[in-house]
Structures are given as C-alpha cells and as structure tokens.
C-alpha cells in the first residue's frame, strides 16, 4: 500500500469526526435551542449540505488547474476551521449561517482533493489495490463519524452547544496538522498551471462570483414553493453558459493558456462525453439516493426520534432480568440513533465484499451499475419502515427504537451497494487530468443536488394556517379560520413575533416558536389545542397573540405521507434506472506505471 495512504486515512477520520459530529446535532440544536420549525431546520441543514457538496466543484478546479491538491487542502482547511470556530462561539441564526457557510466552503473545497488523492497514489502496476484503499478510506469516514455521532449529542445535552461544537472544531485542527505531516509522503500530480496561478484564479473568480450572486438573488426573490429548484437550475445553467462562452467566444483569448487547455480537456471530446454520460446517472439516480440517505443523517429521521413516543431504551427488553437492570435503563438520545449506520457499515462492507458479492456473482456479473440499481430499490424500502413508525407516533402509539434501527439496517445495505460503488466508479471513469473535477461534478454534486431536492420539498410543503386568536393558560388553543383537513397529531409551526411565551423543559420560558402538535380539534369553534412535539403535553402559555406579526403554518405532507412520498419517488427512480443503465458503457482511467515518480 502506498506510504501516503495512512496520512490520508487519518486526516479523513478527524475531518469526518468534525463534519458528522456537527451535522448530527444540528437539527436538535436548531429546533430545541433556536426554536426553528422542523421543516425550516430541515431546509437549513439541507442547504448547508448542498453547499458542502457543491463547493467541491470550486475546490476541484482550484486543485486541478491552479494550486494542486496539497495547497488547496491546506488553504481551505483554514477556512473550515474558522467556520467551526464561529459555530462554537456564536449563539443565533446569523452566526449559525456564517459558520455553516464557511464550513461548507471549507469542507466542500477540500473534499474532491482528499478523495482523489487516494487514487493518485496508484499506477497501473498496483491498481488492483485501489478498491481496497477506497474501502479503508470509506471505513475511516464511518469510524470517525460513528464516534462523533455518539458523543456530540451527549455533550450538547450535558454542556451545551459551545462544547458540542467546540470539540469537533478541535478535531478539524488536528486533521489539518496530520495532512501537513504527510506532505513528503504523497505522490503529487501537478496542477495544469505551473506559472501565474494567482492570475488564473482571479479570472476564475471573476466568472464565478456573478453566477453565485445571481443564483442567491433568485433564491431570495422566488416564492418558497419553487425557490430552491429555481436557484439550482439558474446556478447550473449559468455555469454551463460561462463554460460555453469561455470556449466559443472571444473570451478564450483572455484566459490563461493553462486554464483554457484544462477547460478544453474537461469540456470537449471524450471527457465531455464521459461527463454527459455520468451526469445522467449521478444527477438523477445517485442524487435521489443521497436525498433519501441524508435525511437519516441527522435530519428527518432524527427529528422523528425526538418524540417521547419512540422508546429509546436500547436494551429495554432486558428489563425483567435483575442482573441487567442498569443496561435495560440505558436510553439513547435522538441524535445518537444514527450512529448505528456507521457501525453497520463497518460490519457490512466485508460481508458484502467477501460473501454477498461472490454469491451474487454466481448468478450474474456484478457490475457497478447493477449494484447501484439494486441499492435504489433497497433504500426505498427503508422509507416504508420509517413511514410506519411515523404513523404510529402520529396516532399516539409508542414505538420501539428497534424499528428505526431496522430501517437503518436496510438503508445501510443500500449505502454499501451504492455509495462505495459510486465513489470508485466516478474515479475510474474520469480522464487522468480532470479526476478531481469529475469526482466533484458527478459523485459530490449528486449529493448536493439530492439535498437541494430535500430543501425544495420541505420548503414547498409548508402552507399557511390563517389564525385569528390564541387563548393562553394551562392549555393553549389556536382559533383558526378553518379546521377542515386537519388531523390530531399533525404538526403546526409558529414563527415571527407571536407575542406569546410558553413554559418549556425544566420550566424555561421561551417564545411560542417552532413546531408543535395539534392535540384536540374543536370543530364547532374552529380551534385546535396545542401539544409540545416532544412530550405531547399541553402547552402552558401566557401573553397576547399578535396575528399581524405571527406566522402560523402546517405541512402538506402530513405524518407518514412525508416518508411515503420519498419511498414512492425512490422506487420510481429505481425502475427508471434499470432501463437507463443498459445504455452506459464503462471505461477505466488510471496512471501508467511508467509515469510514477522515481
């Protein structure tokens, strides 16, 4: 195994500890500390992940063309550390947005460089080890994420957000140091530009910043039903336009020669054909996988687990045995349940590699595309389980967390089939000089698009609930214009300046903001009684409602329908993939052994 691989693996372990630790507690932090509505929190977290997996496009170009992988990683890692620091020391929506923005730029910028750096350590002489190296790389991701996902919720619950965000920030600093120590161990693939890199970056940013600015403007001016979709289409269309104008108009004469040559290699000829072919597979099918998978990663699955109706006693079935009473009383935190995904990965990777794939190979040729197709069906099935859980919770029935763990088993099987396969597939299909870019433009951008779709759905499914008055006291009733089509257990969000305070956990007084549940429906008086979303207890409140300043909303996808929507969508995409995959022809690009430095 090449000597640089251990440094890459350790760096990835620490960086993923940081990213997944922070991501694991974001939804709980936003809903319980900042009092975001659940849909709003999902939108924010999805947009954060959108940025984290879109900015690899920028990092890949900077790496491939201007600075090379090492300088790009070290520079953007500092930006990453700054974002973590802002998040750990801040305390409101503004600092949250700034911290997440810097984190997205930093983690996104270094992501394609680190992962493709794995492949760069190999030649045609030892290419048979690439799959094993990528497995080690992926295992380091899941080991780091599993540890942080388990401990960060404990720190948030016991010590608050400063410690819970501060420890991952320290791990990111460690990741930067470890990567720096491996500098002399890496096989270095030089960037396209050997001179004038800073001038080239200036030209690059001159074209990029207007694209980002216009896309952000579109996001702000378009209504919530279509804003994410409109901004995404605008962003991708403008990027294509910039590339076209740069290659086919007089602008080509103003570009540095190395940048122009790189763009011609990336966007013309065989490379363009590869990108086009990969784009359909990744932007539609792999993107849908990530849309579903990321919701299990600290988002809607975690929010589901915050309900007290999910019994989170992991070993509760041992309660009748006196010797195991302490173990039976152990209760997981909602943000911790997702840790089983990483643990299942550690077990399933060797099982699939050495048992399941060989068995499958006796019946048919196990190709990357067939793995992906099977995985799409499998992950859709996991959402049927989660939908059933949500249906029980909505109707006030207790559900064991083991049902959600079962859903994670199914989801993790899909992840092994798709994620590792798609990562390796993207690298092997990419021409040599543009591997970082194609990794970003396919595998990582697919994650970004998947999260954009999640944000789009959660933004579009929110609908206003005209509210005339709110009666406060030991019970809180909201008088509405109409209670038609509302259900008991349905979520209802309060935002803006409601003028009302309520008593939360531990007797803390907070503004009436965030997600609540409809307890009872008084159809005769067109009013609903509010319950808190976690304990399902009556909301105790005081104050005078301000209808002109308050924002009261609910969701179009009620209860289990949210998860059934995604299950159906995933299943439909899986069926379509079966037909599309038959038209794709694979190629493999690796460095020739003769090109390896002495």
Annotate each language-model stretch with its function.
Residues 78-96, 377-396:
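C-terminal ends and interior cores of transmembrane alpha-helices
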Residues 465-553:
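Small/polar beta-strand repeat architecture
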Residues 1-49, 281-284, 291-303:
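Helix-loop boundary and gating motifs at the non-cytosolic
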Residues 65-77, 358-377, 433:
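Cytoplasmic membrane-interface "Motif A"-like loop-to-helix N-cap segments
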Residues 13, 94-110, 395-417:
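Hydrophobic core of transmembrane alpha-helices in multi-pass small-molecule transporters
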Residues 46-63, 146, 339-354:
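Central cavity-lining transmembrane alpha-helices of secondary-active solute carriers
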Residues 109-124, 415-430:
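Intracellular juxtamembrane helix-capping segments at the cytosolic ends
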Residues 3, 124-125, 131, 153-331, ...:
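Intracellular loop-helix junctions on the cytosolic face of multi-pass helical membrane proteins
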């Amino acid at each position: 195994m090449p000597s640089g691989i251990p440094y890459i693996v350790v760096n990835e372990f620490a960086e993923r500890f940081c990213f997944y630790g922070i991501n694991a507690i974001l939804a709980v932090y936003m809903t319980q500390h900042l009092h975001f509505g659940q849909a709003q929190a999902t939108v924010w977290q999805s947009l954060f992940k959108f940025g984290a997996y879109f900015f690899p496009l920028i990092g890949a170009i900077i790496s491939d063309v201007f600075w090379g992988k090492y300088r790009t990683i070290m520079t953007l890692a500092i930006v990453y550390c700054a974002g973590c620091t802002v998040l750990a020391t801040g305390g409101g929506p503004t600092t949250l947005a700034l911290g997440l923005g810097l984190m997205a730029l930093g983690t996104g910028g270094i992501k394609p460089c680190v992962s493709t750096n794995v492949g760069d350590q190999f030649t045609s002489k030892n290419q048979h080890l690439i799959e094993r190296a990528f497995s080690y790389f992926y295992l380091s991701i899941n080991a780091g994420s599993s540890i942080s996902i388990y401990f960060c919720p404990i720190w948030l619950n016991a010590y608050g957000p400063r410690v819970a965000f501060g420890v991952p920030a320290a791990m990111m600093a460690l990741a930067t140091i470890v990567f720096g120590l491996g500098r002399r161990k890496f096989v270095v693939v030089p960037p396209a530009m050997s001179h004038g890199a800073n001038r080239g970056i200036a030209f690059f940013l001159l074209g990029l910043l207007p694209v980002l600015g216009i896309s952000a403007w579109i996001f702000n001016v378009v209504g919530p039903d279509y804003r994410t979709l409109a901004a995404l289409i605008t962003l991708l269309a403008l990027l294509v336009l910039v590339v076209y104008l740069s290659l086919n108009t007089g602008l080509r004469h103003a570009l540095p020669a190395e940048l122009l040559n790189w763009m011609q290699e990336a966007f013309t000829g065989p490379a363009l054909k590869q990108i086009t072919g990969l784009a359909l597979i990744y932007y539609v099918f792999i993107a849908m996988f990530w849309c579903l998978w990321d919701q299990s990663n600290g988002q809607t699955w975690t929010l589901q687990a915050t309900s007290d109706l999910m019994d989170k006693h992991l070993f509760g079935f041992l309660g009748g045995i006196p010797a195991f009473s302490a173990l039976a009383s152990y209760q997981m935190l909602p943000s911790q349940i997702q840790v089983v995904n990483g643990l299942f990965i550690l077990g399933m990777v060797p099982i699939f590699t050495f048992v399941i794939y060989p068995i499958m190979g006796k019946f048919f040729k196990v190709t990357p595309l067939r793995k992906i197709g099977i995985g799409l069906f499998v992950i859709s099935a996991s959402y049927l389980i989660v939908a059933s859980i949500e249906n029980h919770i909505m109707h006030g029935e207790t559900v064991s967390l083991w049902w959600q763990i079962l859903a994670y088993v199914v989801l993790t099987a899909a992840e092994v089939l798709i994620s590792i396969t798609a990562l390796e597939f993207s690298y092997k299909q990419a021409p040599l000089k543009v591997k970082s870019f194609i990794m970003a433009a396919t595998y990582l951008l697919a994650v970004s698009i998947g999260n954009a779709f999640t944000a789009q759905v959660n933004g579009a499914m929110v609908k206003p609930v005209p509210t005339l008055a709110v009666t406060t006291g030991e019970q809180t009733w909201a008088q509405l214009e109409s209670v038609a089509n509302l259900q008991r257990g349905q979520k209802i969000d309060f935002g803006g300046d409601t003028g009302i305070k309520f008593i939360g956990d531990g007797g803390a007084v907070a503004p009436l903001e965030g997600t609540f549940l409809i307890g009872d429906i008084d159809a005769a008086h067109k009013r609903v009684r509010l319950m808190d979303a976690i304990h399902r207890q009556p909301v105790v409140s005081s104050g005078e409602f301000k209808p002109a300043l308050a924002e009261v909303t609910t969701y179009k996808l009620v209860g289990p329908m949210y998860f059934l929507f995604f299950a159906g969508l995933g299943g439909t995409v899986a069926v379509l993939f079966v037909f599309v995959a038959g038209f794709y022809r694979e190629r493999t690009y690796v460095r020739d052994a003769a090109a390896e430095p002495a």
